């Protein structure tokens, strides 16, 4: 059996229970629907491995070129020796970066990561039917573990009444907390904040029912 994914190990068992309870508590005071979604990663980021492999291989090839060129009597600045060294170093280093999350993260492009996580959040939003609630008042709290990014996406009924700026402070606070190791409690606080916003615009209904999953942890 394989080990747990980044998403599956993001919360402890107790934190999972607390997050689920936080969603249920928030939803008990509003007709709005909240889904907390934890993804291990939003993209494979192959360009990070390519860029990282090249940038790590380049100085090694430059260091090896004069030594090997001299050893084979081909000159200390032989371009063919350099290209061979670059290729030989690049291939294993590219694989190393691809397989090492800490290294891989160093070579991510911020704007591209933001776009890719946003696309993954949107796919999760529609894939898990947050656009299909009775009052169009579903809110997705999307956490992408590898990229260390958070998105909050709301359906049309919420967006018609709540300014997008309302979510930015929550996203920034949760992102900072997660990066400092505060996961479960910070997510619970954010869910409570989302519930407070929904309660102001979508009071509970007598016939209200839970339309969506409370917590989804992707493998």
Question: Can you say where each PLM-predicted feature lies in the sequence?
Answer:
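Soluble periplasmic/extracytoplasmic beta-strand elements of cell-envelope proteins
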Residues: 33-38, 138-144, 151-153
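Cytosol-/stroma-facing membrane-proximal "stalk/adaptor" domains immediately downstream
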Residues: 169-219
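Short, charged cytosolic
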Residues: 10-34
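Alpha-helical transmembrane cores and adjacent cytosolic helix/loop segments
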Residues: 3, 8, 12, 43-49, ...
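Select subsegments of transmembrane alpha-helices in polytopic membrane proteins
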Residues: 46-58
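Membrane-cytosol interface motif
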Residues: 107-127
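Transmembrane alpha-helices and immediately adjacent membrane-cytoplasm interface residues
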Residues: 65-106
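Flexible, solvent-exposed short loops/turns enriched in glycine
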Residues: 3-6, 146-182
């Amino acid at each position: 059996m394989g080990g747990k994914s980044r998403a599956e190990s993001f919360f402890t068992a107790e934190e999972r229970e607390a997050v689920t309870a936080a969603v249920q508590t928030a939803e008990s005071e509003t007709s709005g629907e909240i889904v907390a979604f934890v993804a291990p990663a939003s993209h494979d980021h192959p360009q990070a491995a390519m860029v990282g492999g090249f940038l790590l291989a380049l100085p090694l090839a430059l260091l090896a070129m004069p030594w090997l060129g001299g050893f084979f009597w081909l000159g200390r600045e032989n371009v063919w020796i350099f290209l061979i060294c670059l290729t030989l170093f690049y291939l294993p280093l590219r694989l190393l970066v691809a397989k090492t999350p800490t290294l891989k993260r160093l070579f991510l492009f911020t704007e591209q990561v933001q776009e890719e996580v946003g696309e993954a959040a949107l796919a999760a939003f529609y894939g898990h039917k947050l656009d299909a609630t009775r009052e169009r008042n579903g809110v997705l709290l999307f956490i992408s573990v590898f990229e260390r990014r958070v998105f909050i996406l709301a359906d049309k009924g919420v967006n018609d009444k709540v300014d997008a700026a309302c979510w930015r402070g929550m996203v920034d606070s949760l992102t900072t907390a997660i990066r400092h190791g505060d996961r479960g409690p910070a997510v619970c606080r954010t869910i409570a904040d989302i519930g407070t916003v929904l309660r102001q615009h979508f009071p509970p209904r007598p016939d209200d029912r839970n339309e969506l999953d409370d917590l989804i942890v992707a493998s």
